Amino acid sequence: MDPKAEGNGENITETAAGNVETSDFVNLKRQKREGVNSTGMSEIDMTGSQETPEHNMHGSPTHTDDLGPRLDADMLDSQSSHVSSSAQGNRSEVENELSNLFAKMALPGHDRRTDEYILVRQTGQDKFAGTTKCNLDHLPTKAEFNASCRLYRDGVGNYYPPPLAFERIDIPEQLAAQLHNLEPREQSKQCFQYKLEVWNRAHAEMGITGTDIFYQTDKNIKLDRNYKLRPEDRYIQTEKYGRREIQKRYEHQFQAGSLLPDILIKTPQNDIHFSYRFAGDAYANKRFEEFERAIKTKYGSDTEIKLKSKSGIMHDSKYLESWERGSADIRFAEFAGENRAHNKQFPAATVNMGRQPDGQGGMTRDRHVSVDYLLQNLPNSPWTQALKEGKLWDRVQVLARDGNRYMSPSRLEYSDPEHFTQLMDQVGLPVSMGRQSHANSVKFEQFDRQAAVIVADGPNLREVPDLSPEKLQQLSQKDVLIADRNEKGQRTGTYTNVVEYERLMMKLPSDAAQLLAEPSDRYSRAFVRPEPALPPISDSRRTYESRPRGPTVNSL
């Protein structure tokens, strides 16, 4: 990637003019058009204003028949001069009044944000050009609005494509209460009608005549039993930068925001630049803060950086950080297939060799051993053979893509099938383990028997009481994994690195906190939930919130 920042020779791949990977970015306000751009694509003509000739408003003299004695010529000349002078004075006074009036009169909508929407055009394969509202030369036509990908700004600087902006329209509590007793189908119909009214009114206020929502999904794409995309349909392919995961397959993928690049950069002058990340680029294994510093050095300290979500929202980096510290860096890394694992030594998959009768009427403690270690060093052991045959699947746990949590094979296979398949092939386990499961009652009993805390000890993950005092003294925070619980206090069957609890400012489960001799709120006590953001599209006829609002999380 080539930011070409001052004092920085590294490159950031941008889809903007002047960068190594260019999208032929066109500033619509600063370039003349001839109807076709350099790529041969038709330009949106936004400069079609014409001069209107001024017309003099002088009236012709009124002719009246002379029925009386002829007036004295001097008197007539005097009266004519007086009338002409008086008319000119009145006209001058009116013109001055109008000049003063229009010189001071603001245009309708002058108090709206000048960057409340961005229009994006596709100028080639993996190439895009964006223009903010204030940089448009001429108001686009209805067809031109609908041919673009329209991005709407919310109250904290995130930008939403049409279907997601429509989805975020709030239903007033009073209306929701009225609809509560209706059949679900009728509820949905009434809610849609209300949102559509708000949508159309908001577009009229913004001056946008193209109002298509583009919410229709591709009817040729079948969903799984949970109404989610099947693994083979969860990705779109770019020409140069690999695959990108998406959450929905829209009929109009461009207008719905699915094809947009990874990063949107908005300068203080409201110029728009786009950028992709890819494996081995100039920011490989570098943190987002370094990228941010280079971009702001190049474009200005008030430059905004938006990172695309899998749903298609361009999230402001400061907004992401206000919710989860380090989340902007994690997303920045994911674009290039990197992760931000706190402990890169965790085994990719383990099998629990504990929970066996101890010969004294009890059970041995949990002891999760690296599957790779077993297969490499004990290839002929009964445990190794059983694992190869797909047995012991309910004792196996696998590492998630982020490298910071373990989960069951079936859970990972469902949530991240691509990573699951790669991991199982890597360690030599059959993917059929991901299609096994117990009845819920059995599954939750097993979760409840799990150790509250396990720690990394070479190729093992062991319970705290099994560690010697010396090892406990050497224990690092990044070696500790916590058995997670949901909001109801139930075990989820997953383990998460305690450093993630700290990063996310999460409350520790009480049993884990007791073992670690830490208060449950050690990490969560300082957490302050950010103010909810004003949606990108809202009903101007009512107050969004009755309570006073403080500053937004990023003052945008």
UniProtKB/Swiss-Prot annotation:
Glycoprotein among keywords:
no
The biased composition feature labelled Basic and acidic residues covers 52-73, 539-548
Q: Name one GO biological process term.
A: DNA-mediated transformation
Composition bias of kind Polar residues appears in 10-25, 36-51
Q: Where is this region: Disordered?
A: 1-95, 527-556
Q: Where in the cell is it found?
A: Secreted; Host nucleus
Looking at the keywords, is Ion transport present? no
* Cellular component, GO annotation: extracellular region; host cell nucleus
Induction (record text): Targeted to degradation by the host proteasome by VBF and Agrobacterium virF in SCF(VBF) and SCF(COI1) E3 ubiquitin ligase complexes after mediating T-DNA translocation to the nucleus.
Kindly state which keywords UniProt assigns to this record, in alphabetical order: Crown gall tumor, DNA-binding, Host nucleus, Plasmid, Secreted, Virulence
Gene Ontology molecular functions: DNA binding; identical protein binding
Q: What does this protein do?
A: Involved in DNA transformation; mediates the nuclear uptake of single-stranded DNA copies of the transferred DNA (T-DNA) element. Binds single-stranded but not double-stranded DNA regardless of nucleotide sequence composition.
What is known about its subunit structure? Interacts with host VIP2 that promotes T-DNA integration into the host genome. Forms a complex made of virE2 and host proteins VIP1 and VBF. Forms heterodimers with the chaperone protein virE1 that prevent virE2 anarchic homopolymerization. Interacts with A.thaliana VIP1 that mediates its translocation to the host nucleus. Forms a complex made of VirE2, host VIP1 and VIP2 and single-stranded DNA (ssDNA).
Query: What is the protein name for this chain?
Result: Single-strand DNA-binding protein
- The species this protein was found in: Agrobacterium fabrum (strain C58 / ATCC 33970) (Agrobacterium tumefaciens (strain C58))
Gene coding for it = virE2
